[in-house]
Amino acid sequence: MRHYEVVFLVHPDQSEQLSAMMDRYRQIIETDGGCIHRLEDWGRRQLAYPIQKLYKAHYVLMNIECTPRTIEELTSAFRFNDAVLRDMVIRREEAITETSPLAKGEESGGRGYDSARSGRDRDESGGRGYDGARPGRDEDESKENTDRDEQSEDSE
């Protein structure tokens, strides 16, 4: 049997039926002797781009061990279920059982980023990295600008 990582997105209005869908998918996997190593419900999250005019979806991650025939059956179940917006199946070399970084971020109550940065993208100076005149280039430009300004004053 092979190891797979499966992520699928469920329509946000169908979140109540998620447990029934999970039972159906679990039954498909376990019928052929497969097993689920990790099952994480990431909840309702913002989408990176709209899908069918929706901006949020319910995310579910599964790491499973099953036969390729079972994966075909599972993907066809996703395809014929209108509540599943997207699915992705990736073949893995080994079973992944530890908690995903996204689920760890949910457990700690944060967004999963480094708290030492405190959510800032820039350094403490607050600037965009511009420290004044650039050596060589800006000196020449500033000299040209002052020469041009002096010429315009003389012509007036």
UniProtKB/Swiss-Prot annotation:
Gene Ontology cellular-component annotations: cytosolic small ribosomal subunit
Tree of life domain: Bacteria
Biological role stated in the UniProt entry: Binds together with bS18 to 16S ribosomal RNA.
InterPro entries linked to this entry: Ribosomal_bS6 (IPR000529), Ribosomal_bS6_sf (IPR035980), Ribosomal_S6_plastid/chlpt (IPR020814), Transl_elong_EF1B/ribsomal_bS6 (IPR014717)
This protein's record includes keyword Ribonucleoprotein: yes
Protein's recorded name: Small ribosomal subunit protein bS6
Family of the protein in this entry: Belongs to the bacterial ribosomal protein bS6 family.
A Pfam family: Ribosomal_S6
